[in-house]
């Protein structure tokens, strides 16, 4: 399906190629929030080609797999993808996490979680943090097994030099590009001496290449505590997969919660952007699904495409809605999902 926005030129008048975007609605409220993002993209002065692809539990029930090969191919052939949410039932034979598998198959090695203060009353001021999480190895490598007749469960933690080098370099590059002056390398090398030890050693090597950026290291338990005590002290955090997963969800609670948390999964040949929240089955069809995180993920996607002006416009429109209380009930407002979408579109003009 090809959807062309009203204008086919950028605001500068420079012609652009249509951006090929794969939409991954998924399960639960995923289709609802992705539909909202598509509506917003339609009103921007850009040109898009949208393709919908299957992912998640609904795909598994109909196709026998939660991540069809056709979905991976669609993402590979697109400039970027927008993902909604999936339902992952535990202990279902033949079912695997399509999100983890997608990250591995497409080598989406960097998970970027911007944590910024919002105009919401629950948001703490002065926070502008980027968490850079290794996205393809660690304890999420998928190497699990049962032994001793099911009485012992083992998960292998894989940390490689290559994986550590590229995620740490990505974090320091982003710090340099965004004018940040310090980066915290978070690990648990005092206990996990081999895996975190390698990650830490690589960080110390790479940090020498960025003399203008102060490298600080912090144990993960200390970091969790410091995020509660003084989150504004952090500018960039780079860490391994599981640690980053936990810390980023913790940090987003200081700026409004999961309803405003967006994420980017970046590789060398593909990029997938998503809201962090889950599929929220009880909210399906109620009009209460919060599209804010999906809008912010869409802004991240626009930045990735080089459309920084349109990304800023969208982000500012969302923040204007938050400041005015024109939001969904989970953020203290009274708007429906579609109602908030219309407000954002109205601001964008």
Predicted regions and their residues:
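Short, low-complexity intrinsically disordered segments enriched in A/P/G/S/L with frequent Arg
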Residues: 8-10
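Extreme N-terminal starter segment of soluble prokaryotic enzymes
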Residues: 17-21
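Glycine-rich phosphate/diphosphate-binding loop of Rossmann-like nucleotide-binding domains
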Residues: 22-43, 149-221, 233
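Buried hydrophobic positions in well-ordered alpha/beta secondary-structure cores of metabolic enzymes
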Residues: 27-30, 79, 132, 171, ...
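N-terminal beta-loop-helix "entrance" segment that forms/cooperates
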Residues: 47-70, 225-227
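Flexible, glycine/charged-enriched surface loops at secondary-structure junctions
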Residues: 49, 178-187, 210-218, 307-315, ...
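Glycine-rich phosphate/nucleotide-binding loop
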Residues: 59-60, 108, 226-326
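N-terminal glycine-rich phosphate/adenylate-binding segment common to multiple enzyme folds
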Residues: 61-157, 242
């Amino acid at each position: 399906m090809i959807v062309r926005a009203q204008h086919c030129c950028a605001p500068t008048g420079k012609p652009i190629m249509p951006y090929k975007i794969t939409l991954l609605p998924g399960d639960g409220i995923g289709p609802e929030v992705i539909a909202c993002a598509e509506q917003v993209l339609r009103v921007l002065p850009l040109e898009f080609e949208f393709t919908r692809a299957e992912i998640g539990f609904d795909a598994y029930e109909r196709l026998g797999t939660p991540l069809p090969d056709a979905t991976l191919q669609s993402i590979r052939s697109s400039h970027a993808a927008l993902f909604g949410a999936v339902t992952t039932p535990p202990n279902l034979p033949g079912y695997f996490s399509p999100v983890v598998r997608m990250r591995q198959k497409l080598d989406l090695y960097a998970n970027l979680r911007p944590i910024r203060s919002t105009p919401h009353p629950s948001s703490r001021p002065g926070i502008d943090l980027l968490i850079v999480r290794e996205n393809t190895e660690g304890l999420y490598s998928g190497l699990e097994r049962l032994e001793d007749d099911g009485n012992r469960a083992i998960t292998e933690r894989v940390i490689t030099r290559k994986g550590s080098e590229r995620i740490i370099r990505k974090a320091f590059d982003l710090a340099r590009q965004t004018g940040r002056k310090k980066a915290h390398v978070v690990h648990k090398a005092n206990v996990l001496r081999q895996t975190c030890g390698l990650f830490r050693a690589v960080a110390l090597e790479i940090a020498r290449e960025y003399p203008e950026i102060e490298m600080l290291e912090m144990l993960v338990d200390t970091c969790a505590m410091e995020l509660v005590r003084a989150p504004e002290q952090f500018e960039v955090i780079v860490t391994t997969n599981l640690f980053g997963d936990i810390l980023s969800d913790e940090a987003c609670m200081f700026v409004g919660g999961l309803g405003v948390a967006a994420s980017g999964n970046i590789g060398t040949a593909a990029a997938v952007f998503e809201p962090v929240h889950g599929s929220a089955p009880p909210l399906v069809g109620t009009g209460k699904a919060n599209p804010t995180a999906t809008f912010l993920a869409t802004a991240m996607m626009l930045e990735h495409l080089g459309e920084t002006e349109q990304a800023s416009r969208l982000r500012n429109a969302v923040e204007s809605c938050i400041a005015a209380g024109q939001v969904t009930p989970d953020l203290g407002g009274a708007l429906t999902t579609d109602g908030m979408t219309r407000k954002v579109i109205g601001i964008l003009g």
